Amino acid sequence: MLQACKMEGFSLTAPPSDDLVTYDSELYQRPMHDYYSFVGSDGESHSDHYWDFSAHHVHNNEFENFPENHFTELQSVQPPQLQQLYRHMELEQMHVLDTPMVPPHTGLSHQVSYMPRMCFPYQTLSPAHQQSSDEEEGERQSPPLEVSDGEADGLEPGPGLLHGETGSKKKIRLYQFLLDLLRSGDMKDSIWWVDKDKGTFQFSSKHKEALAHRWGIQKGNRKKMTYQKMARALRNYGKTGEVKKVKKKLTYQFSGEVLGRGGLAERRLPPH
């Protein structure tokens, strides 16, 4: 028996009734809210909605009337593999959403490792501490290789040449400069003999800076000479033997060799 149907003015003829498969529209219809519940559920409950869909409504005896050529072979994919694939894709999407977006114009500055350092406060000395006694200055360490503080190591003056004479090519040293002042009596308010025969002399506590200033002019220094620098040069002479420190305050002693050379040069000076 043929069943004829009209559709938009065209006549459609159905196949023979022997090959006709009954189709129940209500059997395969599924409400839309089921699909929304599938999308909104978590990953663990997806498999329940997905794999129970066909097993709940479709029965094996309904497909017995279909010939073999009406079926399409599906790929053999196990449900656990599909669940793992879906969870992997879901985790990637969550990772993309959680990643903060950095503006392209934002520049990342280079971070420099911070290393803390300990800083000690600088202690300023009052004028009273700066003008300390010569014994306290003797306790401080002097540069081991320096003979004097910026002092030029010139040659010994030859016979007939006055120490510090203008136009002289020989550079005077500190102990020679002090010996000349003591023997000439110049600046006797700043330096004087304690024992001339032993070569012991002493500086004035009030006028020692004036003597140091004159020594700086004699050397031609650009920086101001102080007694502290001059005393350090005298202590360095204690290592070479020309001058040594005496226990008495601001007191020093020439060596016998320096006194002998000074006496020889004094005897050879031309008479006035």
Curated annotation (Swiss-Prot):
Record-annotated DNA-binding residue ranges: 172-255
Modified residues (Phosphoserine): 142, 148
Pfam families (UniProt xref): Ets
Any GO CC annotation of this UniProt entry: chromatin
SUPFAM superfamilies linked to this entry: Winged helix' DNA-binding domain
Signal peptide residues on this chain, from the entry's feature table: none
GO biological process: anatomical structure regression; apoptotic process involved in blood vessel morphogenesis; cellular response to ethanol; defense response to tumor cell; endothelial to hematopoietic transition; erythrocyte differentiation; follicular B cell differentiation; germinal center B cell differentiation
UniProt subcellular location: Nucleus
Biased composition (Low complexity): 155-165
InterPro entries reported for this sequence: Ets_dom, ETS_fam, WH-like_DNA-bd_sf, WH_DNA-bd_sf
Tissues of expression: Expressed in spleen, thymus and bone-marrow macrophages.
GO MF term (any one): NFAT protein binding
Positions bound to DNA: 219, 232, 235, 245
Highest taxon in the source lineage: Eukaryota
Positions of region (Disordered): 126-165
Activity regulation annotation text: Transcriptional activity at macrophage-specific genes is inhibited by interaction with GFI1, which results in inhibition of SPI1-induced macrophage differentiation of myeloid progenitor cells, but not that of the granulocyte lineage.
Keyword flag Transcription regulation: yes
Keywords annotated in UniProt: Activator, Developmental protein, DNA-binding, Nucleus, Phosphoprotein, Proto-oncogene, RNA-binding, Transcription, Transcription regulation
Disruption phenotype: Knockout embryos die at a late gestational stage, with no viable embryo after day 18 of gestation. Mutant embryos produce normal numbers of megakaryocytes and erythroid progenitors, but some show an impairment of erythroblast maturation. They exhibit a multilineage defect in the generation of progenitors for B and T lymphocytes, monocytes and granulocytes.
Disorder noted: May be involved in murine acute Friend erythroleukemia. It is a target region for SFFV proviral insertion.
Protein family: Belongs to the ETS family.
PANTHER family found in the cross-reference section: ETS, TRANSCRIPTION FACTOR PU.1
Quaternary structure, from the entry: Binds DNA as a monomer. Can form homomers. Directly interacts with CEBPD/NF-IL6-beta; this interaction does not affect DNA-binding properties of each partner. Interacts with NONO/p54(nrb). Interacts with RUNX1/AML1. Interacts with GFI1; the interaction represses SPI1 transcriptional activity, hence blocks SPI1-induced macrophage differentiation of myeloid progenitor cells. Interacts with CEBPE. Interacts with IRF4/Pip and IRF8. Interacts with JUN. Interacts with RB1. Interacts with TBP.
Function: Pioneer transcription factor, which controls hematopoietic cell fate by decompacting stem cell heterochromatin and allowing other transcription factors to enter otherwise inaccessible genomic sites. Once in open chromatin, can directly control gene expression by binding genetic regulatory elements and can also more broadly influence transcription by recruiting transcription factors, such as interferon regulatory factors (IRFs), to otherwise inaccessible genomic regions. Transcriptionally activates genes important for myeloid and lymphoid lineages, such as CSF1R.
UniProt protein name: Transcription factor PU.1
